Structure formats: C-alpha cells, structure tokens
Amino acid sequence: MRKTRVTAAEVAKLAGVSQPTVSRVFTPNSKVSKEKQEWVRDAAQQLGYLPNTLARSLNTGRSRTIGIVLAYLKNPFYTEALEKLSAGFRAHGYHIMTFFASNMAEDVDEVVEDLLAHQVDGIILASVSMSNTLTGRLQHYGIPFVLFNRGQPDRSLASVTAANFDGGRRAAEFLVAGGHKHIAHIAGWQKSLNGRERRAGFLAGLQEAGLAPFHVVDCHYRRAVAVEATRNLFSGPRVPDAIFVGNDHMAFAVLETLREDLGLSVPGDVSVVGYDDVAMAAWKTFDLTTLRQPANRMAEATVSILLSMIENGAASPGRIEIESALVIRGSARIPKGLTRNA
C-alpha cells in the first residue's frame, strides 16, 4: 500500500500536461480547456491525488474560506439560509467555516478574532451584533464582511436584509383590511434593527388606519416567551382579534397556544400573521399567513456582494433591502378582493 502522497508532477505525467496546468485545474476560476480538465481529473482519480489547499493558499494569498457567524439555528429560517449560503460559495470554489456566538457584541468580537486567526477571506455575520471596535478592526485589516439579515444604524456597511419596515406595515394593512380592530404585536428582539423596523412598520400601518395597537410585547424571538405573552393577551376581559408575530418561529408557538391551550379558533376567533415563510409555514398544521423573507434571494445577494469585495476589491454597496411578499394562507381572515396565494 502506498503511504506517500501523490504529487502534482505525477498527475501531470500521467495526464500528459505540465505541472502548472494541474495546479490551474484545481484552482477555481482558472482558465483551462475542458479537454485538459478531463485528462487531469481522470489522472488524479486514478492516482488518488488530493490537491494541497494549504500550499495553494500560500501561493495565491487566499484561503478560499468564508467564515459565517450565527447566533442560533433554532429558527428554521437560518437553517435554510445557511444551506443556501454554503451552496452559493461552494459553486465558486469556496469553503465555509461556521462559528456560533450569542447576540452580545462582545461574544461576536471574540469569535471573529478566531476567524481572523484562520485566515478567512471574508466574513458573514448572520443576525448577530457587532461592536464599532470590531467594525474598525475588520476595515483596518481589509477583511470584507457582509451583515446577513441584520441591519446596522451605519447604512454604509454592507448588509442584506428584508425590507422589514415595509413588511411590518403590510402585515398591519392586511389585518386592518380584514376588519380587525384590536391587533396585538408579539415582536422580535428590540435590540435588533430588524425587530425594531418590523414593529415600527406595523405601528405606522395601524396609525395610517387610525388605530392604536392592542398591545406590543418584545418576545426576543423566543418561543417560550411568545407562549407566555399569548396567554397574557387572553387573560383579561379585553382580548385581541388579531396578532402580528415577529417571526414564524414564534408564530408556530402562538398558534399552538391559541388552539391547544386556550381552545380558540384560528382564524375564527383570532387571526395570526407571521414573518419569514419558512417551509413549516405551509404545513397543514399551521397553514400560516406570513411575510416571505426570501432566503434564496438574500443568500444570492450576500454571496455576490462578498465575492465582489474579495475578488474585485469592490466597495461596500451599503444596505440592500429585499421585498417581503405577503403569503396568504389560512391563519388569518382574508379581506374581500384577495385570495389564498399559497
């Protein structure tokens, strides 16, 4: 059994090409004819050749590795988004390193320091906070980064989010059009710009209709907190006739609480609208009307922006907002003139 590593020179000899050609075949985006690529890959497979990515990174000055920092995967939206991001970067010959951190800026700073030690080419911060100190360090070292699904007050930073204010307003307009007068909001974490903007859009939509919110409560994107908030909303003599929930993850908990714990009919007694349109929203169990946060389009935009910054030295495009479409199912009363669209 052979114990020594197969070399590029051996592959080149068997394939009948030069050694630099072998290197180019295994370097993403290098120009090599399709015929020579087939020769080299066939020879590599026969010999059991494995490209030396470390050596290539030393030659090119790039690791072809992207670091992704996430706060959690409990929300199905992030599971889908991570899959889309990984596939997008793999298609361009990049590998992914995933790190987890809490939403505290200090924890994120520490994790990013680890990523920098791994010589990543770029960083995606997915729904986590970052300090001004970290922003300055990344800019100082010339490490491109994109904020995914997390806006920052500094709109010059590269970020990709849903149009959260508009989405919140559309949720309010839809519920008002359905004849609801007492609309509550189980809001997302108010220390995140996304949560604040969805709340602000919702309140603006109600104000335009001459309505005040029944009640607004920050549930931190946590199911258990959303369950408790739902019970509290229905514990007194006055109750809401509709609830806009800051994301689907919490909306599922709200629906279960309304139906199973409180014995209420949805949408007969109360309408529910979520935000994200994760796959589970279409399940018959939930049949959730929601605002679609398009993970695929957001991931495509994020990949494109970060690669342009890495490979072309492109400047930050600032904040990119992608429209959230209203997906009408069966958890909310449907206004006249509208129909289910999913």
Residues of each region from the PLM?
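Bacterial carbohydrate/catabolite-sensing allosteric modules
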Residues: 1-3, 46, 84-95, 132, ...
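N-terminal helix-turn-helix DNA-binding module of bacterial transcription factors
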Residues: 1-64, 333, 342
